[in-house]
Regions:
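Outer-membrane beta-barrel strand-turn architecture
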Residues: 55-59, 98-102, 136-140, 175
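Helix-adjacent hinge/juxtasegments
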Residues: 81-103, 107
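Outer-membrane beta-barrel translocator/channel fold
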Residues: 66-85, 111-115, 147-156
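Cleavable N-terminal export/targeting peptides
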Residues: 1-28
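Short glycine/proline- and aromatic-enriched beta-strand/turn motifs that initiate or cap beta-hairpins
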Residues: 20-75, 90, 104, 114, ...
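Outer-envelope exported proteins of Gram-negative bacteria
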Residues: 52-54, 64-66, 91-95, 107-111, ...
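Outer-membrane beta-barrel "beta-signal"
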Residues: 134-138, 143, 163-175
């Protein structure tokens, strides 16, 4: 089931990205790079980067795609052992953007997320991610983005479902 979810989500994201030719002259694109931070209920706080592209397909609507990579480690200690857990988080999301005016637009995204943990062994979990945010363009070629990103994963243990919630802040170039 997880592999089907990952394959389907990845296919949708890649087809969406391919459907938006960023080399077109008539429509604007905004590439942004920024800081991302997320907190998982089992792996602690993760920090990393987010790369995004917003392609304006019409005067009001666009397509936003993003890739996030976050990393973190956390010490643990219990009755039987102690050590450090290293966690990596990858997301590939896509969705629509709505241009409210020349300076402000909103976006939402969905797509696959991979959480990779290393302790005594390796454990990977596939889930789905979702994101929403705002992009502010104070001048014609610069954009500032602020967004929320969350993810849900299937639990492989008895302590409940694994999820993450975080934010991202980026600066982009619009052309």
């Amino acid at each position: 089931m997880n592999k089907m979810l990952l394959a389907g989500s990845t296919g949708i994201v890649l087809l969406s990205a391919a459907a938006s030719p960023v080399w077109a002259d008539d429509n604007a694109s905004t590439f942004s790079l920024g800081y991302a931070q997320s907190h998982t209920n089992h792996a602690g706080t993760l920090r990393g980067v987010r790369l995004a592209n917003n392609y304006e397909m019409s005067p009001d609507w666009g397509l936003t795609t993003s890739f996030a990579w976050l990393n973190g480690s956390q010490r643990y200690s219990d009755e039987s052992s102690n050590g450090r857990v290293t966690t990596r988080y990858y997301s590939l999301l896509a969705g629509p953007s709505w241009k409210i005016n020349n300076q402000l637009s909103l976006y939402s995204q969905v797509g696959p997320v991979l959480l990779h943990q290393r302790d005594h062994g390796i454990d990977s979990k596939v889930g789905y991610g979702y994101s929403a945010g705002v992009a502010y363009t104070p001048v014609s070629s610069v954009a500032i983005t602020l967004g929320y990103e969350g993810a849900d994963f299937d639990a492989t243990h008895n302590s409940g479902s694994l999820n993450s919630n975080g934010f991202n802040l980026g600066v982009g170039y619009r052309f």
